[in-house]
Amino acid sequence: MGDTVVEPAPLKPTSEPTSGPPGNNGGSLLSVITEGVGELSVIDPEVAQKACQEVLEKVKLLRGGVAVSSRGTPLELVNGDGVDSEIRCLDDPPAQIREEEDEMGATVASGTAKGARRRRQNNSAKQSWLLRLFESKLFDISMAISYLYNSKEPGVQAYIGNRLFCFRNEDVDFYLPQLLNMYIHMDEDVGDAIKPYIVHRCRQSINFSLQCALLLGAYSSDMHISTQRHSRGTKLRKLILSDELKPAHRKRELPSLSPAPDTGLSPSKRTHQRSKSDATASISLSSNLKRTASNPKVENEDEELSSSTESIDNSFSSPVRLAPEREFIKSLMAIGKRLATLPTKEQKTQRLISELSLLNHKLPARVWLPTAGFDHHVVRVPHTQAVVLNSKDKAPYLIYVEVLECENFDTTSVPARIPENRIRSTRSVENLPECGITHEQRAGSFSTVPNYDNDDEAWSVDDIGELQVELPEVHTNSCDNISQFSVDSITSQESKEPVFIAAGDIRRRLSEQLAHTPTAFKRDPEDPSAVALKEPWQEKVRRIREGSPYGHLPNWRLLSVIVKCGDDLRQELLAFQVLKQLQSIWEQERVPLWIKPYKILVISADSGMIEPVVNAVSIHQVKKQSQLSLLDYFLQEHGSYTTEAFLSAQRNFVQSCAGYCLVCYLLQVKDRHNGNILLDAEGHIIHIDFGFILSSSPRNLGFETSAFKLTTEFVDVMGGLDGDMFNYYKMLMLQGLIAARKHMDKVVQIVEIMQQGSQLPCFHGSSTIRNLKERFHMSMTEEQLQLLVEQMVDGSMRSITTKLYDGFQYLTNGIM
């Protein structure tokens, strides 16, 4: 059994008839698992290997054969994966495994000792339990990741690698950092089990390819430079960037030899021009971007991409599909590095606006914003809306990005460029002038501009001869329809009976809304982001859309992103995953805690992008702009104590405060000054900046020794120590901790896997994981947990170190 070699390749379905997809035996499997759950955690590795070898027998038998998709069509297998977009999940175990108990009984010799017979029977039972667990509905992606990480048997690892194809893409994507970190830093068997799935998904999605390439580079940076160059992570990253993993139908396409309309070029000249432009896509713009010495390990990216584009140019194929996006990202990062050299916030803001104005000369292009959740093309960056955020040493900045949503990024043509002076604001179809743009005009819009030496072919953009303006669908009398709305038309969805609303209630609510309209912040040259962040998101979208030449298009969307240079966002990504997992746990357990995980894109070990929290400003900005206490600000924004708006905002504050207090305790989040705590328009608080978690603290000063930050101002908003909402806050803390410890393994494994091979400061010390587990207090009763929560709340509220750290931040950084 130990000599058997397991081939951890992707699933290659056989032509044998199958008994149905896994998990179809629902009831009986679940009952067996429930009865034997106490023994599942102690499974003999030898038994596990035998079980999974049997399950993977079909894979080994067909090594070198032609796989067949679930539709009956053959699949090409390149780099260990099929081209077809549909991969069939593992079938039920072969018949010999389902009948293993009978076979075991037949093979036991009559003269075998009773001890040996008992061992075989126990092994058979454990093997059956393991297989049934893997095939049951209880086996989710979290359990798959756990077995992949903890198992030492190639058979188990290969089986789990193939089972990844059965899970939803978004479920696996959540664990992508863990999968890639295991691929880089664990043994070959784990890597061989993971690679087929990664390769398959890279063929399907260009965004997945980008994320894999970025994460592989970032998580390989902790390795020694000589080891890194030859590591499996670097090789897979090169494979992705070389464009070998693009869909087969795209890879086989040749550039069209027919000239586009109005180009005035012969077919031969035009083909040569496109080929040159595409092949040099990754070189031209990056040639003038300043490199920083902060991360010399990744300076070979340009060389790798350059060599890959040369081979593509020689093979006369389509351009490297990731090259335009990588250039777009590098341009944004280069802007941040240049801003950091300027002394004042005002100079940084002016430079940012001018840099983004130049950037617009390259748009629209085949680029996208990776933090978005839908396919789109970037068409414009409203440069005057960008702001520099607060930072003492660096220059993170916030930009808004106009995009056009599309069904498929790869197959949809890049939108035509509409000049800024052609269309400003379109309120009706009649106001739309007939717009056309010639090829010469389009080329002019991508002409060489200052600070970008000879970069007019840096981003791959589809050649468009004539602009086609897509008109929105006309809805007649849409304004009149609003005025015709009446109370009589409001009906219950279930009973269809009229719903009567008291006129007094309507009048009272309207008067409350008019009396307590959210205040606007004054413009501060030292803090220009305050005004931009305070503006309601819907109002900002409306205003930018009216001033955009693309705003009349029905698929126009506005996105925002924070660009950070000089910061390692890998810890931020880890914190995002933990918050997302806790949010899911509390929803599953129906605990009304509120937290707001925001997306993180790790670009390298010292740069990245962050999804901004809209309709939110920091408590520091609130106190500085309003010169009010937190409670008085709530009263100003939401009305008096008895209004619906105030009571709703107060409840939101309590639920979010309790949620983030638990997060800060479990992850030991530090650097909790008022600049890192946001307050949104609905009363929630949102903690940001998780750069100091677990074993790390700012400058190792050790100021913050309390479990979490709970100031007297927070308690005042809750109604004081004797208020019902303060008791509600403590009850939520207890319920949230009880719910979290029920699912401790799901949280701990996220952190534990990322510690593998990592040099991040949050993992310094050998007791990081042990201390994390201890904070779940698995051995305590609920009564003991309640006492613990009382002690933590009391200690945090009276903590002198919290006050000292706030004072330190005020003296050194001016944070109130």
From Swiss-Prot:
Region (G-loop): 541-547
Cofactor: Mg(2+); Mn(2+)
Annotated spans, Interaction with ACBD3: 2-68
Region (Catalytic loop): 668-676
Record-linked CDD domains: PI4KB_NTD, PI4Kc_III_beta
PTM annotation (Phosphothreonine): residues: 263, 438, 517, 519
Membrane topology: Peripheral membrane protein
SMART domains given in the database record: PI3Kc
Domain PI3K/PI4K catalytic span(s) in chain numbering: 535-801
Stretches for region Activation loop: 687-711
Subcellular location: Endomembrane system; Mitochondrion outer membrane; Rough endoplasmic reticulum membrane; Golgi apparatus
Keywords per UniProt: Acetylation, ATP-binding, Endoplasmic reticulum, Golgi apparatus, Kinase, Lipid metabolism, Membrane, Mitochondrion, Mitochondrion outer membrane, Nucleotide-binding, Phosphoprotein, Transferase
GO biological process, one term: phosphatidylinositol-mediated signaling
Tree of life domain: Eukaryota
Subunit structure of this chain's protein: Interacts with ARF1 and ARF3 in the Golgi complex, but not with ARF4, ARF5 or ARF6. Interacts with NCS1/FREQ in a calcium-independent manner. Interacts with CALN1/CABP8 and CALN2/CABP7; in a calcium-dependent manner; this interaction competes with NCS1/FREQ binding. Interacts with ACBD3. Interacts with ARMH3, YWHAB, YWHAE, YWHAG, YWHAH, YWHAQ, YWHAZ and SFN. Interacts with GGA2 (via VHS domain); the interaction is important for PI4KB location at the Golgi apparatus membrane. Interacts with ATG9A.
Similarity section: Belongs to the PI3/PI4-kinase family. Type III PI4K subfamily.
Protein name per UniProt: Phosphatidylinositol 4-kinase beta
Taxonomic source organism: Papio anubis
